[in-house]
């Protein structure tokens, strides 16, 4: 089984020429811990360092006017929400205004990462009813840094794919861009539902997360399809 999975950056480099933003050390945090934010202010451990390096590489790849970063992966359990959340915290500590948006509307992973309850309204409530909902009323402070806010996925709608296909999504993202330096979208695994491919239209960059000994090599190769279809202006991998 393990031969079939990605083991390290060497494997990734054999499978694709998409640049690698960084390789995270294995995290000792059990998922039962309160949230899984490991980046803390003024703390220098290996995880911290790695996310700082990740942040530097990310900012280097983005042009000044590129603010929207989409995070995806091949399948669930690859650490996509973990990477999104911690990179967001790292950017916030750099003094950037950041909002993380839970676009994996079917299975909200951000709630776990930030230790928030599942039953709150979020982006889906705005997309369903943009006339009556104020988007910024649905945004909540992260409680971690004053620079970081969270916009959860919200109520699970009967038709997530149709919902994210509406041009209301563009309107929502434009509003967020007017108030934040960076908008991070935590989306569904791209191999599983079409939502993420549809959401790609509002993103400047895709960070594709894979996990050592979890992500199958065959499935990971889908990243080359994303590269060849030019769905994203920029594309990079985190292991």
Regions found by a protein language model. Give the residues of each.
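Phosphate-binding/switch loop-helix module in NTP-utilizing enzymes
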Residues: 58, 153-193
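Inter-motif core of Ras-like GTPase G domains
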Residues: 195-213
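Well-ordered beta-strand positions
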Residues: 97, 182, 205-208, 236
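Short boundary/hinge segments that flank catalytic cores
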Residues: 1-97, 103-120, 124, 129-132, ...
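NTP-binding/hydrolysis catalytic cores, primarily Walker-type P-loop NTPases
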Residues: 127, 167, 198-200
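Conserved G/P- and acidic residue-centered "switch" motifs that form tight phosphate/ATP-binding loops
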Residues: 81, 102, 186, 204
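Structured cytosolic domains appended to multi-pass membrane proteins
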Residues: 105, 150-152
């Amino acid at each position: 089984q393990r031969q079939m999975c990605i083991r390290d950056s060497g494997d990734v480099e054999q499978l694709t020429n998409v640049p690698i933003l960084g390789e995270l050390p294995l995290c000792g945090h059990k998922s039962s811990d309160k949230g899984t934010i490991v980046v803390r202010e003024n703390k220098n451990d290996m995880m911290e360092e790695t996310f700082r390096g990740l942040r530097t590489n990310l900012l280097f790849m983005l042009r000044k006017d590129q603010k929207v970063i989409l995070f995806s992966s091949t399948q669930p359990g690859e650490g996509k929400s973990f990477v999104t959340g911690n990179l967001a915290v790292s950017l916030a500590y750099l003094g950037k205004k950041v909002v993380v948006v839970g676009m994996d509307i079917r299975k909200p992973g951000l709630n776990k990462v930030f230790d928030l309850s599942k039953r709150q309204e979020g982006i889906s409530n705005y997309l369903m009813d943009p006339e009556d909902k104020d988007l910024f009323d649905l945004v909540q402070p992260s409680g971690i840094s004053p620079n970081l806010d969270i916009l959860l996925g919200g109520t699970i709608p009967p038709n997530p794919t149709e919902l994210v296909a509406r041009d209301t999504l563009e309107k929502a993202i434009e509003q967020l861009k007017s108030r934040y330096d960076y908008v991070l979208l935590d989306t569904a695994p791209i191999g599983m539902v079409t939502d993420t491919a549809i959401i790609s239209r509002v993103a400047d960059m895709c960070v594709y997360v894979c996990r050592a000994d979890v992500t199958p090599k065959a499935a990971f190769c889908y990243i080359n399809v994303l590269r060849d279809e030019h769905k994203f202006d920029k594309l990079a991998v985190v292991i």
